[in-house]
Amino acid sequence: MMQKPKKTFSQFSVNLQELALISFILLMFCSCQKKTETLKNTDFIPQSIISLSPASTEILFAVGAQNQIVAVSDLSDYPPETKSLPKVGGFDGKTLSLETILSFKPDFVYLTDGMHNFLIEQLEQNNIKYYISSSSSINDIFSEMMEIGKITGHQAEAENKVDWLQNQLQEITDSSSVNLSANADSTAKQKNVYYEVWNAPYMSCGSSSFINDIIEKAGGKNIFANLQDAYPIVSEETILAENPDIILIPQSSGISIDSIKSRNGWNKMQAVQKNQIYLVDDNLLSRPGPRAINAVQNLAKILNTQ
């Protein structure tokens, strides 16, 4: 059973940090679920949409369907316009209810696989159409944006947005490849990356995770890419043995760079010796939405730091 990290701040601040990190982990686990068949009835254009995750909200805005949204999840905080939208509740079943959802009289609900499946039968009983998000890679995000654009009547906007994002991604990956090629005769190499999801016990990201896809597209090599599980528990001994070049820590974890450096034996790591420890915005890394490209871009800059 996952243990809570040691409390090193005030009780109030730690509770907020734990809430953010738990939400982050829930988002990650849900984003790696197997692709499911969602409702494909597109003979209508929804006018009263409820989005139950931050990533879904960002996708709706990205394809131009923001004026059709009647409510969003409490965790939806981007773009800034979401602050003025009514909130339907949190991300999981403990803070969501069918009664609250029905009070907004939606004709379409945007769900996340693995988290909102308990609502499906009830939505069907109330003749409310839905879509189940299950993206586990950037290419999945592009496909989902196209589907949502078509469903909401914004197919052209979705195509334009996806084309633009694909071009942005291509520029990033091309640049990363050029940097590696240019330094082929030097000591430069593809950098090994350790992403710390949790530290008690240690948890990282495997090959089937959304974060692994971001690391690879940025030009890095995930030290746990050999593990199939999306977010496996790993040993500290293995982390030390892998000797990563880069250490990434989610900002919401409350873990400081100094605390990483002070861990027993970690001072021998390349990443620690060369000060290559970074606090990263886990909202970008954990949300399978259009800003995943920003996550790739930010990580590519880190990887290209000499």
Where are these regions (language model features)?
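Structured C-terminal subdomain patch of bacterial secreted/periplasmic proteins
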Residues: 47, 142-145, 150, 159, ...
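His/Asp/Glu-enriched short active-site or ligand-binding loop at hydrolase and phosphoryl-transfer sites
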Residues: 73, 208-231, 251, 279
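A ligand-binding cleft/hinge motif common to bilobed small-molecule-binding domains
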Residues: 115-125, 246-263
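A short, structured surface patch at a secondary-structure boundary
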Residues: 48-114, 223
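Extracytoplasmic ligand-binding site segments that recognize negatively charged/polar headgroups
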Residues: 118, 133-147, 190-210
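Short helices/loops that flank or line small-molecule/ion binding pockets
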Residues: 96-105, 121, 125-126, 234-243
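Short secondary-structure boundary segments
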Residues: 53, 113, 197, 227, ...
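Bacterial Sec-exported substrate-binding components of ABC uptake systems
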Residues: 3-8, 16-18, 28-58, 96, ...
